[in-house]
């Protein structure tokens, strides 16, 4: 087996692809995307054939999440095997409920105003894009099914086996304290922009 690592300029954020190749099989991993560029779009179409085996969105800072939203909006036909997304989450560890109709309406407006391309990004928490990404994943049956909603990435996790002799993922960041800070910031921004409290109930 051998691995091919591809990185792309994505504003001040990250966009990393790893392809694990064993015999005739290829396993593709995408990690974050601050800006969905034409180069990334072409890579996904020509090298990955519009399929990602594992999409990892490490946290909801703008420079990690914006391009993922843009990718899914621009390429709704893309298939994804599994999704790890450190979505907004309560400190108790309970996940946020599926969006109410009222909140969904607010987020639809945010989605419509999401730019197709960003020329820069400030690297700060972005409530709009965090909500939009969750909404996009929940509405698409294939992506919704692929989203591991109980899996929350932090550096204290045990290594995650990929199976089929492909090795394992070792998580070295983010820390739980960093995620708690993001969670609190998100809850504050969510209330400010949607006028609704973050819902304390499991995902549907």
Can you describe what each PLM-predicted range is?
Residues 15, 55, 166-168:
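Extracellular structured ligand-interaction cores
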Residues 9, 59, 173:
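Conserved residues at beta->alpha junctions
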């Amino acid at each position: 087996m051998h691995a091919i690592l591809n990185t792309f300029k994505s504003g001040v954020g990250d966009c990393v692809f790893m392809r694990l190749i064993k015999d005739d099989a290829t396993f593709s991993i995408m990690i974050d995307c601050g800006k969905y560029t034409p180069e990334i779009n072409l890579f996904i179409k020509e090298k990955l054939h519009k399929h990602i085996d594992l999409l990892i969105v490490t946290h909801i800072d703008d420079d990690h999440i914006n391009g993922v939203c843009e990718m899914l909006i621009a390429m709704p036909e893309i298939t994804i095997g599994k999704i790890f997304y450190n979505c907004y989450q309560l400190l108790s560890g309970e996940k946020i409920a599926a969006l109410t109709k009222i909140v969904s309406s607010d987020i639809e407006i945010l989605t419509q105003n999401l730019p197709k391309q960003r020329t820069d990004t400030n690297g700060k928490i972005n409530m709009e894009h965090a909500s939009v990404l969750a909404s996009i994943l929940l509405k698409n049956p294939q992506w919704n099914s692929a989203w591991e909603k109980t899996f929350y990435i932090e550096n204290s996790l045990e290594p995650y086996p990929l199976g089929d002799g492909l090795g394992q993922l070792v998580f070295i960041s983010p820390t739980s304290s960093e995620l708690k800070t993001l969670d609190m910031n998100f809850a504050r921004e969510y209330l400010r922009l949607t006028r609704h409290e973050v819902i304390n109930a499991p995902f549907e």
